[in-house]
Swiss-Prot record:
GO terms for cellular component: extracellular region. The record marks 67, 220 as: Ice-binding. It comes from the Bacteria. It is found in: Secreted. A motif (Ice-binding site motif (T-A/G-X-T/N) 1) lies at residues 220-223. This is Ice-binding protein. Binds to the surface of ice crystals and inhibits their growth. Has ice recrystallization inhibition (RI) activity (the ability to prevent the formation of larger grains of ice at the expense of smaller grains), which may protect membranes from freezing injury. Has high thermal hysteresis (TH) activity, which is the ability to lower the freezing point of an aqueous solution below its melting point, and thus the freezing of the cell fluid can be prevented protecting the organism from ice damage. The TH activity of this protein is 3.8 degrees Celsius at 14 mM. InterPro entries: Ice-bd_prot. A motif (Ice-binding site motif (T-A/G-X-T/N) 2) lies at residues 232-235. The lineage of its organism: Bacteria, Pseudomonadati, Pseudomonadota, Gammaproteobacteria, Alteromonadales. Disulfide bonds join 75-93. Residues 1-27 form the signal peptide. Keywords: Antifreeze protein, Disulfide bond, Secreted, Signal.
Length: 253
């Protein structure tokens, strides 16, 4: 009998361990920021969207409470819907939907406050604000200064891992520099909460959800995989802006 119990344990232990590893792997880092209706937009702005033609935007675009006349993208630049609070938006494609936009803008503010309020931070003042050249693990990062991406930066984690970047100053990405994802990390799980402005340099590559208190400026030729959610304006210059995907895609070399 004793031998049978012992043998049973020998059988049960690997079965239990196998079931643990076969199950869902727990995500590292904080839980994701809930975007609500703001998460249905690739670009959302309270005071307007300017553009140097041509840009390409995949996903929905919206402006509120400012008039639709401040949404300066052309219909052929957007694969998705363009929502405005009145009939002054781009013709013939803009959709007058003030209630949806009011809700989305409210949710954008709630998401910003949520991201800004996450405690405790796992990393504070990392690199004294210079994160270029670093590989970042999942977690909450906090700076009381500007954050600069002067060389390429890497986010390494699984598809379920989450990063929240709490930035009290501005976010600056240098020209032709890249935000790179490895290990399965997804742009939809990287949240940049920026109290100042966000400036992405020319021909750069950026990943993540930007929740900016003020301006988001995307300079010539830059590609963004994520969302641009600004409490003031968004400026584009011949850019490619794609809503984040649900699956990991290896970045081209």
């Amino acid at each position: 009998m004793k031998t049978l119990i012992s043998n049973s344990k020998k059988v049960l232990i690997p079965l239990i361990m196998g079931s643990i590893f076969a199950g869902n792997v727990m995500a590292a880092g904080p839980y994701a920021v809930e975007l609500g209706e703001a998460g249905t937009f690739t670009i959302l702005s309270k005071s307007g969207i300017t553009d140097v033609y041509p840009s390409t935007v995949t996903g929905n675009v919206g402006t509120s409470p400012i008039t639709g006349a401040a949404l300066l993208l052309n219909c052929d630049e957007v694969t998705g819907a363009m929502y405005t609070v009145d009939s002054a938006g781009p013709l013939p494609c803009s959709i007058n939907s003030p209630y949806l936009l009011e809700l989305a803008v409210s949710d954008m503010g709630i998401a910003y406050n949520d991201a800004a309020g996450r405690v405790p931070a796992d990393h504070t003042e990392l690199g004294t604000g210079e994160i270029g050249g670093l590989t970042l693990e999942p977690g909450v990062y906090k700076w009381s200064s500007d954050v600069n991406i002067s060389t390429d930066v890497t986010f390494n984690g699984t598809m379920d891992d989450v990063w929240i970047m709490q930035i009290s100053g501005n976010l600056n990405q240098a020209n032709a520099k890249r935000v790179t994802l490895t290990g399965g990390a997804l742009a939809k799980n990287i949240f940049w909460q920026v109290a100042g402005y966000t400036a992405l340099g020319t021909y750069a590559s950026f990943e993540g959800i930007v929740l900016s208190k003020t301006l988001i400026s995307v300079n010539t030729g830059t590609t963004v995989n994520g969302r641009l959610l600004a409490q003031t304006a968004v400026t584009l210059q011949k850019n490619t802006i794609n809503a984040p995907t649900e699956q990991y895609e290896e970045a081209p070399l």
